[in-house]
Amino acid sequence: MKHSKKTYDSFQDELEDYIKVQKARGLEPKTCFRKMRGDYLETCGYKGEVNSRPTYRMFDQRLPPETIQTYPRSCTISQTVENRLPQWLPAHDSRLRLDSLSYCQFTRDCFSEKPVPLNFDQQEYICGSHGVEPRVYKHFSDNSTSTHQASHKQIHQKRKRHPEEGREKSEEEWSKHKRKKSCKEIDLDKHKSIQRKKTEVEIETVHVSTEKLKNRKEKKGRDVVSKKEERKRTKKKKEQGQERTEEEMLWDQSILGF
């Protein structure tokens, strides 16, 4: 037959019921609370004790009692964390909240600043490691010296190579300069030849034009002279023709009687 889960009005009622059940079974509930729990319960209005998890008890048994210390500062931190948690959580959540706070308190107490006593094997291991340190230091120093020598050698080789590289660079630059100069000279020669041709063509055109002008002038002069001569000839011919006609007329009159 399944038992229905009881509902509790508060965490205190649930805790009291749990303690009663444990006592009825003949078991004594283990409780491990610190001052922080009591202060918290008093402030919240709860009374009684809360069972701690058995895992924490197991950790307490494993570690020596010298390592566990109480820190009042941790108590205040846990209280501030508890106060920041929301109040609307149910009773089960509040129980988990208290358990998580007790676990934080426990871990804080366990990992204290007090050193744990070492056993014989650990001491032997530490002594052996101290013996190894000089050899490791020697190995590192040898490596550093070898790297320093190698770097010095590389620098020396670079310096040796540097003048040769400088010479090669200067030769390359000189050849480039020569090439540029030759290209410039070729361009200048081409430009000069083009200019020369242009000037020659211009001179020829001027010469031809002047010759043409001269020829035209000469032609014009000849034409004028020839025209004048022709006019003179025509005049002479006319005059001669007129004289003949008069003679002929006189002849005709005398002989023919006209």
From Swiss-Prot:
Biased composition (Basic residues): 150-161
Domain of life assignment: Eukaryota
Compositionally skewed regions (Basic and acidic residues) per UniProt: 162-175, 183-213, 220-232
Positions of region (Disordered): 142-258
Keyword Cell cycle listed: no
Swiss-Prot/TrEMBL keywords: Coiled coil
UniProt KW Transmembrane keyword: no
Coiled coil stretches, renumbered: 211-248
PANTHER family assigned: LYSINE-RICH COILED-COIL PROTEIN 1
Protein name: Lysine-rich coiled-coil protein 1
